[in-house]
Structures are given as C-alpha cells and as structure tokens.
C-alpha cells in the first residue's frame, strides 16, 4: 500500500473545523444595558403606589441618577486625594454630599445614607 500524501495540492489539512463552535447560536446576544430603572420604579411605588412612569421619564430619571452618582463619586475621589488616602470611605461620600447638595436636601441625604450604612453593617 502506498504512503499517504501529506503535502502538495491534494493534501487535506487536519485541525480546525469550519463553522460555529459547539453551543453557539446563529444570532448574537445583545449586550445588556445596566440601568437604575427597577430601583426607581420600586421607590415610585413606595411613594405613589397608584402612579406609573413612561419610558421617556424613566430614561430621564436614569440619566439624573447616573449624573448625581458621578458627581458624588468625583467629589469623594478628590477629597480622598487631597487627604492622601487611597480609599473612599463613607466619610468622603458624606462630605461630598454636603458639598454638592443644597441645605435641607443635604441633611436628609446624609441622614438616609447613615441609616442605610447602619442597616448594612448590622446585617453582616
């Protein structure tokens, strides 16, 4: 019996099979968009149980929450940097809230934040 031809025109390459890998589907999965939507909806239902929210209003609220988050995080980061700290603690966040939010709103935000941190630490 003659030896198999491994090079030249008629040689077949062994190795990777063409096509999709096992378990892959035809359609690509869309990347999930993260949003505060479910949390905004939960708070809305706590405050006004009989009120709904449109998708446009939800989008505006989501943008608002992202904006406030970025402002607080940026200010807290700056405060940590000024004090030569590499970690943002609740103290930096609290100070950032006091600097960014006006008067009574800052007081309420600080008290709610303190309450949330206390609840979290006691549940651990």
Swiss-Prot record:
Glycan attachment points: 111
Subcellular location: Nucleus; Chromosome
Keywords, in A-Z order: Chromosome, DNA-binding, Glycoprotein, Isopeptide bond, Nucleosome core, Nucleus, Ubl conjugation
Annotated InterPro entries: Histone-fold, Histone_H2A/H2B/H3, Histone_H2B, HISTONE_H2B_site
One GO term describing the cellular component: nucleus
Domain of life the protein comes from: Eukaryota
Gene Ontology molecular-function annotations: DNA binding; protein heterodimerization activity; protein-containing complex binding; structural constituent of chromatin
PTM comment text: Monoubiquitination of Lys-119 gives a specific tag for epigenetic transcriptional activation and is also prerequisite for histone H3 'Lys-4' and 'Lys-79' methylation.
Record bears the keyword Nucleus: yes
Segments of skewed composition (Basic residues): 10-19
SUPFAM superfamilies, per database record: Histone-fold (SSF47113)
Cross-link annotation Glycyl lysine isopeptide (Lys-Gly) (interchain with G-Cter in ubiquitin), location: 119
UniProt region (Disordered), positions on chain: 1-32
Pfam families: Histone (PF00125)
Subcellular location, principal: nucleus
Keyword Signal among record annotations: no
Function as written in the Swiss-Prot or TrEMBL entry: Core component of nucleosome. Nucleosomes wrap and compact DNA into chromatin, limiting DNA accessibility to the cellular machineries which require DNA as a template. Histones thereby play a central role in transcription regulation, DNA repair, DNA replication and chromosomal stability. DNA accessibility is regulated via a complex set of post-translational modifications of histones, also called histone code, and nucleosome remodeling.
Subunit structure, interactors included: The nucleosome is a histone octamer containing two molecules each of H2A, H2B, H3 and H4 assembled in one H3-H4 heterotetramer and two H2A-H2B heterodimers. The octamer wraps approximately 147 bp of DNA.
PANTHER family attached to this UniProt entry: HISTONE H2B (PTHR23428)
Family indicated by similarity: Belongs to the histone H2B family.
The protein's name in its UniProt record: Late histone H2B.2.1
């Amino acid at each position: 019996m003659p030896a198999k031809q491994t090079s030249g025109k008629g040689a077949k390459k062994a190795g990777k099979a063409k096509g999709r890998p096992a378990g892959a589907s035809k359609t690509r999965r869309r990347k999930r968009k993260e949003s505060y939507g479910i949390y905004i909806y939960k708070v809305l239902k706590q405050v006004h149980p009989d009120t709904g929210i449109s998708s446009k209003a939800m989008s505006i609220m989501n943008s608002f929450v992202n904006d406030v988050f970025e402002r607080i995080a940026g200010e807290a980061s700056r405060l940590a940097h000024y004090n030569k700290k590499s970690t943002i603690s609740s103290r930096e966040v609290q100070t950032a809230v006091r600097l960014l939010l006006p008067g009574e709103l800052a007081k309420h935000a600080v008290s709610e934040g303190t309450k949330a941190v206390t609840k979290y630490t006691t549940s651990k």
